[in-house]
Amino acid sequence: MKYIVGDYLYLGSKENEINNNFTWLMRYLYREFVLDYDKMKKIYGHIESDNNYDDIYNDNNFRDILYFEPNLMDDDKYIYKYENNINLDNDIDDIVFYEEIKNLILELQVYLSEKTTKRLRVMGITKLKLVNDFGINKYVGGIRDLDWKLHFWPEYTIVNDNYITLHELIIACFKIKSHKFETYHEYFMKFDEFHVFSCVKKKDGLNTMCKEIIAFVNFNHYSSL
């Protein structure tokens, strides 16, 4: 199966196939894309927050007496960067973990070496709603000072009549995480529920079939609490 044709990413036609491919795509995105801390700090560094504990610079003894609370105010712009760390040739952990979906990873690596995430569209999907099924991870392990200034979105919806872009999906992935700069203490596991609904949209005066997805996301909250 070829996943990327032109600027379109194809994840299948049946619900179980889309679910499986979407799960692996999310694992890939959380592994390969990270929020750009320095650029995010330029945008949100001035925001006032009740705490500025940073697990990198502060005494880790605070881990057991502090509880993380994100900013209640909605945030907006997110800036991320592409790490491209997965090595399917030499790293045995990557080879074993991604074996089932190796071709998808390889096609994404080739595409992203030449084009941007804003150009790649997920074929047929015009609406995606991600729901964080596990809520805020209050453990401060891995928390940065910026996390206190950013908003936790318990759910986030993308709507794009021209099909959602990989860029929009990446932003949604970060919006629904409470620990936005690390994946060790808040790790994407799977979808607890995944529903695909058929829809019809008008394009060039013609009816075109499309899909809308609602996915309930399972995050593993690792902590010593």
From Swiss-Prot:
InterPro entries: DUF5868 (IPR043840). Pfam families: DUF5868. Belongs to the mimivirus L31/R44 family. This is Uncharacterized protein L31. The lineage of its organism: Viruses, Varidnaviria, Bamfordvirae, Nucleocytoviricota, Megaviricetes.
